[in-house]
Design a protein with these regions (language model features):
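Compositionally biased low-complexity segments enriched in polar/charged residues
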Residues: 1-4
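Amphipathic alpha-helical repeat scaffolds
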Residues: 35-40, 55
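C-terminal alpha-helical interaction modules of replication/initiation AAA+ assemblies
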Residues: 11-23, 27, 32, 49-167
Length: 167
């Protein structure tokens, strides 16, 4: 079994069900605000803030939703800036998927119990820390917008610059 539970003093005990966290988080924040703030913190490289908001997400049972968003974030924002990260995420993704498959989907507390899984916590915090520290490049930010006139032969000729230097 993939559930490695932690010391009882670090365990989150709460009687609320997963349905209680559809729109608001464990502490009563709006779900969309928490998730957007988490990714803004990652964008700005604020590790402590990102870890705080990640904790809020994990306590609220958003474990697998956040995991998918972190993978997409890596593909869209970091990708070639940290080429070793994709292999690291692949290995961690296998562990996360095995844990997800081991959860009884009919159990009312199954997904919420992931917040008390030591492996899941460690994987998430290490990935978020790495994402915070990685260089980021937004897709398409650095590329100029092209117009139809940019493809006219005359405009192309004007842009060619060739200096002839004879040795």
């Amino acid at each position: 079994l993939f559930f490695v539970f932690m010391d009882s003093k670090y365990t989150i005990v709460d009687s609320r069900l997963l349905e209680s966290f559809k729109k608001s988080t464990f502490s009563g924040y709006k779900k969309t605000d928490v998730i957007s703030t988490l990714f803004k913190s990652i964008d700005n490289g604020k590790i402590e803030n990102a870890c705080n908001w990640l904790t809020e997400c994990l306590c609220s049972g958003y474990t697998f939703d956040i995991w998918q968003r972190l993978l997409i974030y890596n593909c869209n924002t970091i990708s070639i800036n940290n080429p070793n990260l994709i292999l690291y995420l692949y290995k961690k993704n296998k562990i996360i998927n095995n844990i997800y498959r081991s959860i009884d989907k009919n159990d009312r507390y199954g997904i919420l119990e992931c917040r008390n899984n030591d492996k899941i916590r460690n994987i998430f915090f290490s990935v978020v820390t790495i994402l915070c520290m990685s260089n980021k490049t937004k897709k398409y930010d650095k590329y100029p917008k092209l117009k139809d006139t940019d493809f006219d032969f005359e405009n192309i000729q004007k842009r060619f610059v060739a200096n002839v230097y004879l040795l």
